[in-house]
Amino acid sequence: MKLSQIALICIVIASLFAMHECERLEATEEEKSSKIYVPPCYETICSFSLKKDCWCCFEPLVHKNLCWGVHDFPNAKELCFNEYSKKI
């Protein structure tokens, strides 16, 4: 009887330690995830196809996107990054 009580106490202590470590890891993940990185230019879907066919540049000051279609502008990615570098 005494051995089973000691084993039960050890299991409870180990479980509490594991829960504490898990909560500590979740807290550090929340601190890291609070900083969201938004890339300046991203490839997205602009037409009705399921293919990413344009590049958009997000302007945080005016909260709007400038987009260039790959069909109209073959160098859409370069245009997007050039436009973003002008804003800095």
From Swiss-Prot:
List keywords of the entry alphabetically. Disulfide bond, Signal
Which Pfam family name is an example for this entry? ESF1
InterPro entries named among the record's database cross-references? ESF1_brassicaceae
Q: Which GO terms describe its biological process?
A: suspensor development
Expression by tissue = Expressed in stems, leaves and flowers.
Kindly indicate where the leader peptide sits in this chain. Answer: 1-22
Q: List the disulfide bonds.
A: C41-C56, C54-C80, C57-C67
Indicate the family of this protein: Belongs to the MEG family.
**Protein's UniProt name:** EMBRYO SURROUNDING FACTOR 1-like protein 3
Say which species the protein is native to: Arabidopsis thaliana (Mouse-ear cress)
Source organism lineage? Eukaryota, Viridiplantae, Streptophyta, Embryophyta, Tracheophyta
